[in-house]
């Protein structure tokens, strides 16, 4: 692409300049992943999580509280954090009146990712000007919100405590992380429903590519409990058929899928400019070569709760273009696939965007079969799983999918939906998320 400029149009061409924008694009900094952290229903650290996803271990359990509250769906995925573990990340003062599961999960995942990247937690007087965080969430401190409402309505405002604002403000998670790590670059929170985690990674990627930071801690988190999940239960989008068989409840791409299983957790990634990672001898998990976010505008078939297929396909194609990847180079897809009626449509959108069908379609899997739908945390938890697949050379299985939906089998081959772990070297993997509000995000990860 070239563009001609003249100094003065009235005087005619005095001088002409040709600017090759392709060269400018090639000057974008390469960005790699140097650290991972995970708090998931089936694994709190990388070792436990990797073991779980390789072996198809579910983190979905029956929840007595949901039964007591007469939820239709009485199963969910919730990370188990002991009091002892909390004290490894928070001091006694911080834990006083602390009741925010989302911030808890996010801080643990973030600090673990930071340490995994070989970075230190130093109490310096000066911030780390080269490092920042964009860490997303859908809500913050919903449990603290509930407590605060009761106290205010009971005329006990003075008993709210000094940390209620920090726990309930939308940016609470990034503020906690920024303070613990002394981050001096951008420290902010994004929120785009189920696309939040994927979007946070793309935002961090762009900041590094543009030379505004050397490294960014990106990811997302989601609160736990009935006050988050109740609205979805009321919408009848959660399964109610597996209260007695929790591990069988989350069934993406299955003919017997009956709705998603709510869950929670957090995923975190340290992403870094390649030059910086090489200079300090950091471990490199994979490279992020590009991505894209867009919206269907809630037009056409798009609504507040349903995606516009044209927008989804445009998002995938734009991500590939940004990454300079041909559709035929995609080895695997980590889908959004929630175990609802929209799974068929998602597969169709992938086939249209990639122009690949039948036996030519890449492998595709859904982490939600094991951990449920982590809402705002889903994109980041699934991205951690995607990166692990590239780094360790495997494709995790789709559990609860022994009866693949016939409409899906009309589009792609059965072998594209692995039921058992496959050991395979992966070069390029796509990760996509689609959320309420008709918003979409897609990332392209590549082996380094």
Residue positions per predicted region:
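A glycine- and small-aliphatic-rich helix-loop capping segment at beta-alpha/alpha-beta transitions
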Residues: 47-54, 141-158, 207-210, 230-242, ...
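Active-site-proximal alpha-helical scaffold in enzymes
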Residues: 106-119, 170-173, 178-181, 187-221, ...
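Condensing-enzyme catalytic core mediating Claisen C-C bond formation in acyl metabolism
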Residues: 30-34, 57-62, 245-323, 331-332
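Conserved beta-ketoacyl condensing-enzyme motif
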Residues: 33, 54-189, 221-231, 327-344
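ACP-dependent fatty acid/polyketide chain-elongation machinery
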Residues: 17-95, 117, 275-287, 384-399, ...
């Amino acid at each position: 692409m070239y563009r001609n400029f003249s100094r003065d149009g009235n005087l005619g061409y005095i001088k002409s300049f040709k600017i090759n924008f392709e060269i400018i694009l090639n000057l974008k900094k390469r960005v790699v992943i140097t650290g991972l952290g995970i708090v998931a229903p089936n694994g709190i650290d990388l070792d436990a999580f990797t073991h779980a996803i390789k072996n198809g271990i579910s983190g979905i359990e029956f929840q007595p509280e949901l039964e007591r509250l007469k939820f239709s769906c009485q199963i969910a995925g919730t990370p188990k954090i002991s009091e002892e573990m909390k004290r490894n990340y928070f001091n006694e003062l911080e834990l006083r009146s602390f009741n925010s599961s989302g911030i808890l999960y996010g801080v643990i995942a973030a600090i673990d990712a930071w340490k995994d990247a070989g970075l230190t937690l130093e109490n310096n007087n000066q911030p780390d000007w080269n490092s920042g965080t964009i860490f997303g969430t859908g809500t913050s401190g919903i449990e603290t919100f509930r407590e605060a409402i009761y106290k205010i309505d009971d005329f006990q405002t003075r008993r709210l405590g000094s940390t209620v604002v920090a726990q309930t403000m939308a940016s609470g998670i990034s503020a906690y992380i920024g303070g613990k790590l002394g981050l001096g670059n951008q420290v902010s929170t994004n929120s785009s429903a189920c696309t939040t985690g994927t979007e946070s990674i793309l935002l961090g990627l762009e900041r590094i590519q543009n030379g505004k930071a050397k490294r960014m801690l990106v990811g997302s988190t989601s609160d736990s409990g009935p006050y988050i999940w109740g609205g979805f239960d009321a919408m009848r989008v959660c399964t109610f058929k597996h209260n007695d068989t929790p591990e069988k409840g989350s069934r993406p791409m299955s003919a017997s899928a009956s709705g998603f299983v709510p869950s929670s957790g957090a995923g975190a990634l340290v992403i870094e400019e390649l030059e910086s990672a090489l200079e300090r001898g950091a471990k490199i998990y994979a490279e992020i070569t590009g991505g894209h976010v867009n919206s269907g505008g809630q037009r056409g078939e798009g609504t507040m709760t349903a995606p516009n297929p044209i927008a989804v396909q445009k998002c995938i194609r734009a991500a590939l273009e940004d990454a300079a990847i041909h559709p035929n180079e995609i080895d695997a897809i980590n889908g959004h696939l929630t175990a609802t009626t929209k799974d068929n449509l998602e597969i169709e959108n992938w086939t249209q965007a990639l122009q690949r069908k039948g036996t030519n379609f890449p492998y595709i899997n859904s982490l939600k079969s094991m951990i449920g739908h982590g809402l705002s945390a889903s994109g980041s938890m699934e991205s951690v799983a995607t990166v692990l697949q590239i780094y360790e050379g495997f494709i995790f299985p789709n559990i609860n999918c022994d009866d693949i939906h016939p409409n899906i089998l009309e589009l792609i081959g059965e072998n594209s939906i692995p039921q058992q772990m496959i050991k395979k070297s992966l070069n390029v993997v796509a990760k996509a998320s689609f959320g309420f509000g008709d918003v979409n995000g897609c990332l392209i990860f590549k082996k380094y």
